[in-house]
Amino acid sequence: MLENTAIIIAITTGFVAFIGGYFLRKLLGEMKITSAEERARLVLEEAAKEAESKKREAVVEAKEEILKLRNEVERESRERRSELQRQERRLVQKEESLDRKLEALEKKEENLAKRETELAKMHEELKALHQKELQELERISGLSTEEARQILLQDVEKEIQQEAALLVKEIEGRAKEEADRRARNIISLAIQRCAADHVAESTVAVIPLPNEEMKGRIIGREGRNIRAFETLTGVDLIIDDTPEAVIVSGFDPIRRETARMALEKLISDGRIHPARIEEMVEKARKDMEVQIRDTGEQAAFDANVHGLHPDLIKLLGRLKYRTSYGQNVLKHSVEVAYLAGLMAAELRADEKLARRAGLLHDVGKAVDHEVEGPHVTIGVDLAKKYGESPEVLHAIAAHHGDEEPETVEAVLIQAADAISAARPGARRETLEAYVKRLTKLEDIANSFPGVEKAFAIQAGREIRIMVKPDKVDDLGAVRLVRDIARKIENELEYPGQIKVVIIRETRVVEYAK
């Protein structure tokens, strides 16, 4: 019973609590709704107030903008009116100025028309007066107008021709003076930049000896060594009282140098006899060929000329042992190449061509004693043979005036050749004449058939002639020596007498095996 009562009480209490809670919750909800509505109302009121405020601000701003635009429009309108007024005033002023100018122009036209009428009247009067004067002049002079005009034109033409001739002469004189001045300047610059060596040529070479005993060994038994040496080399070997020295004398520098080299080798070797002399002379000739080639290559290098044919190099080397009036021809050729190159550079011509032609211009002198003809013709033939250009050939051919120079380089070679030859101390007449006489003496002997070699010795007082034994017998040698002596008497001028010696040698060699 009590338990049921407790259950009922609990149920009743729970129900009451539930009902109470429900109403409490509902009451709280209504209170929240009321509070939210109040807040919403406040928000709406605030928004309405803010919107009203912004609306008023927008209206104020719009009014201000309208006022600003109105002021701007009014200002621009005032400025435009002012500008229009200024332009209107300028137009009025221009119109007034144009009116004044038009009025002045009309006055000038009236004056010009009046002046033109006066000038026309004066022209007619002058024409009539001129015609009257012409008639009077024709009556007095007896010439028609056309005849007088022709005479006047002829006089004027003569006067103008004289003035033109004087003007041309003056211009030519100034041009020539300027050309001479520039030429002197170019040549002086070239000469100042060219430092040429002077070589004093000699016909002897002095060879030192280790002792006086060596002189006897050089002479040999009954002079066989010295005779063999002189016969093989074609020079004079002078052994005198000069202490510890012998002298090699010969006008041909190549022979003299070959003999010097051979004798120095013999002295160094110590074995001196005819067979050894022949061997050393042959070796010296080969060494001489090498030295000639090296000399030619050095000359081409000094002249800055490249691409020469090897045979031309050898011919250049031979020029070292050739003189022209005492001037070394190789030194002269290098000097001409250098001068021609400098002048060509100043004139903006072909410097390489000028140097090449200058180096080769006297190459014919290397063989002119072996080949007939002037050295210019020989040089042209040699250069053509070894593939030189037509410009180089022309410069060589024209350097002595045998051809008219047609290029600037050819003229420069002529000038450089003359400058080098005319330099004080460059050439001597005496030595050249002496060498020419000895060369002529040898040429006379070599012109006869059967002659193998001919050597002029003893300063031209003796000539030794080697003949071919298979072509000239003993009787033929007697006839030949007389013919050579007679031809020397007829063709050569010389002091005193010349000894002509013919040597006929038959050499038989056999080897024992």
Curated annotation (Swiss-Prot):
GO CC, one annotated term: plasma membrane
Localization annotation: Cell membrane
A GO molecular-function descriptor: RNA binding
Key words, A-Z: Cell membrane, Endonuclease, Hydrolase, Membrane, Nuclease, RNA-binding, Transmembrane, Transmembrane helix
Domain KH: 203-266
GO BP field: mRNA catabolic process
Major localization class: membrane
SUPFAM superfamilies, per the entry: Eukaryotic type KH-domain (KH-domain type I), HD-domain/PDEase-like
Signal peptide: none
Residue ranges occupied by any HD domain in the UniProt entry: 329-422
Regions crossing the membrane: 4-24
Function in brief: Endoribonuclease that initiates mRNA decay.
Family of the protein in this entry: Belongs to the RNase Y family.
Protein name, per record: Ribonuclease Y
Organism encoding this protein: Desulforudis audaxviator (strain MP104C)
Gene: rny
